[in-house]
Amino acid sequence: MNSQFAGLTREACVALLASYPLSVGILAGQWIALHRYLQQLEALNQPLLHLDLMDGQFCPQFTVGPWAVGQLPQTFIKDVHLMVADQWAAAQACVKAGAHCITLQAEGDIHLHHTLSWLGQQTVPVIDGEMPVIRGISLCPATPLDVIIPILSDVEVIQLLAVNPGYGSKMRSSDLYERVAQLLCLLGDKREGKIIVIDGSLTQDQLPSLIAQGIDRVVSGSALFRDDRLVENTRSWRAMFKVAGDTTFLPSTA
């Protein structure tokens, strides 16, 4: 599924990634069924897998380390979100493990520019070649948006969290929509070439408003695996974007 990224420039990779509006939080499923999930997602032409790497220090939870990235099939695009105390070390390990997209937390590193600059020089394998590492920055609900201004030229993805990492306290929908509007206003003409992502316990009811605002992608985990209906739920979520006119990525059965 990721062979189409082989040999593309960073700008071309970003444009292609922007046509995939769903990243599946694969760790939210039952791990014993992981092989089945991956087969189902591949059959659905769903290439983006989202992995939350938590170390129990940046936030209370502990999930997996960079080693897990390398255990997933190379055919997928591995979309890694770092919520760790040492983002520099984790970023290096994730590149070595084959992560295609790496998103850092704005609150988690005093040397963000250094880490992002280094990531901008890295490439990782895809089927039939390599692609540049795509860089992201993520913000907790209470983090001022303007912290991203100094690093805008060093990121391709801007991710807004709708929950506080590890605690589960969600933003009200109205506050989330207002935050998206504020981000778009802040970006202005610098919006071009950026993928805007919303992550954190979203519901389908929120999607129409977010899509109408112009976001590019959502991350969903538990909602997709609910009732052991990954295929049906994935199709249903993607269909929300299909209504909005973005049908590039959809298989004919969706």
Swiss-Prot record:
- Looking at the Swiss-Prot or TrEMBL record, what is one Pfam family this protein matches? Ribul_P_3_epim
- Parts of the chain that traverse the membrane: 14-34
Gene3D superfamilies named among the record's database cross-references = Aldolase class I
Q: A GO molecular function for this record?
A: racemase and epimerase activity, acting on carbohydrates and derivatives
Gene name, please?
lsrE
Enzyme class of the recorded protein, top EC level? isomerase
Predominantly, its location class is: membrane
Q: Where in the cell is it found?
A: Cell membrane
Similarity section: Belongs to the ribulose-phosphate 3-epimerase family.
Name under which the protein is recorded? Putative epimerase LsrE
The Swiss-Prot or TrEMBL record lists the needed cofactor(s) as: a divalent metal cation
Q: What is the lineage of its organism?
A: Bacteria, Pseudomonadati, Pseudomonadota, Gammaproteobacteria, Enterobacterales
Q: Which residues bind substrate?
A: 81, 166-169, 199-201, 221-222
Extract the signal peptide range: none
Q: Which residues carry out catalysis?
A: 52 (proton acceptor), 199 (proton donor)
What is the UniProt remark on how the cofactor binds and its stoichiometry? Answer: Binds 1 divalent metal cation per subunit.
Tagged with keyword Plastid: no
Task: Write out the GO cellular component annotations.
Answer: plasma membrane
Q: What membrane topology is annotated for this entry? A: Single-pass membrane protein
Q: Which residues form a coiled coil?
A: none
Keyword Isomerase listed: yes
InterPro entries for this protein: Aldolase_TIM, Ribul_P_3_epim-like, RibuloseP-bd_barrel
EC assignment: 5.1.3.-
Which UniProt keyword terms apply here?
A: Cell membrane, Isomerase, Membrane, Metal-binding, Transmembrane, Transmembrane helix
Annotated GO biological processes are:
carbohydrate metabolic process
